[in-house]
Design a protein with these regions (language model features):
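Conserved short beta-strand edge segments in small beta-sheet-based binding/regulatory domains
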Residues: 20-38, 260
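C-terminal structured domains
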Residues: 25-26, 159-260
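Short glycine-rich, low-complexity/disordered patches
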Residues: 26-34, 98-120, 233-253
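An N-terminal, globular interaction/scaffold subdomain
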Residues: 2-28
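Short, flexible loop/turn elements at secondary-structure junctions
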Residues: 3-5, 32-34, 72-74, 208, ...
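Well-ordered, non-membrane alpha-helical segments in soluble/globular domains
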Residues: 10-13, 82-93, 216-234
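Long, hydrophobic alpha/beta structural blocks
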Residues: 50-52, 59-157, 181-186
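Short, low-order "capping/linker" segments at domain edges
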Residues: 37-58
Length: 260
């Protein structure tokens, strides 16, 4: 099951994977994300290319990912006529080299060059070793990755108590940051895509005025954990997936995906 390179699509696919009945799993192995395949050769129309045919220049980003520049002599003639096909081919090769989930986790993006850079290059087939040298372990399955993909963030809160929800947030963690970014910028692309499949994404909020004393921070986090556990106990894991939470000046927030 391919998320087509999008973290947001991993969640529905992992949910589908976990809901598969035992009668299906007796005959099928369900993997989320294209698996790495050493020696993979892509053949599509006039394209016949391997990872060994692609030169690679990698730069580590501040958030411990890599930004790639790729050059492939075999694809250069096609680049002028059909840029999208070349990007698709190279994206496919990256996925097959390190696995699609690892590509989502570790590749910040890549550029395609029509000429090689004047710097020593590695081959794309060496990307797994490069990532491992950075202390990164490749992910085989989308479920394992999502369970360990929390991103911590800090924001400058709006002090006006009448401001919109979440604008008071100063710290939080989330497994799907695009959901928060879309909300704060009044975009609905991802939520609209989820709604088409009967999926609802949102957050619960609760006032923090009742939390006082030296243990206030711990009490707020404990309450959020207890709220999450109570919902999971009563609704069941098949009904909801929690994405993280946030603490604001006036409210606490619990982010979730609800499944129909």
């Amino acid at each position: 099951l391919s998320p087509e390179g999008l973290r947001s699509r991993l969640f529905p696919l992992v949910y589908f994977q976990k809901q598969a009945p035992e009668s299906v799993l007796e005959h099928w192995n369900i993997w989320v994300g294209r698996q790495p395949c050493e020696g993979f050769e892509l053949r599509a129309g006039e394209i016949e290319v391997r990872a060994d045919d692609v030169q690679m220049w990698a730069e580590e980003t501040e958030d411990h990912q890599v930004s790639l520049v790729l050059y492939c002599e075999k694809l250069t003639p096609i680049l002028k006529e059909d840029t999208d096909k070349v990007w698709w081919a190279l994206s496919m090769l990256v996925d097959q080299t390190i696995g699609e989930v690892s590509a989502i986790a570790f590749v910040a993006g890549f550029d395609v060059y029509a000429q090689p850079k004047d710097e020593p290059a590695k081959l794309l087939s060496e990307l797994p070793e490069l990532l491992q040298s950075m202390g990164l372990s490749l992910w085989r399955d989308g479920s394992d990755y999502l369970e360990n993909s929390y991103l911590a963030y800090e924001l400058k809160p709006v002090e006006d108590p009448e401001a919109d929800w979440r604008l008071d947030v100063y710290t939080g963690s989330c497994r799907l940051p695009v959901l928060i970014n879309d909300y704060l910028t009044a975009r609905s692309d991802m939520v609209d895509e989820y709604h088409k499949d009967g999926i609802a994404a949102g957050f619960l909020l609760y006032p923090l005025s009742g939390f006082t004393g030296e243990e206030r921070v711990k009490a707020i986090l404990d309450f959020r954990d207890n709220l999450r556990d109570a919902i999971l106990r009563d609704a069941g894991e098949e009904a909801v997936t929690f994405l993280g939470g946030a603490t604001g000046l006036y409210c606490g927030y619990l982010d979730f995906i609800a499944w129909d």
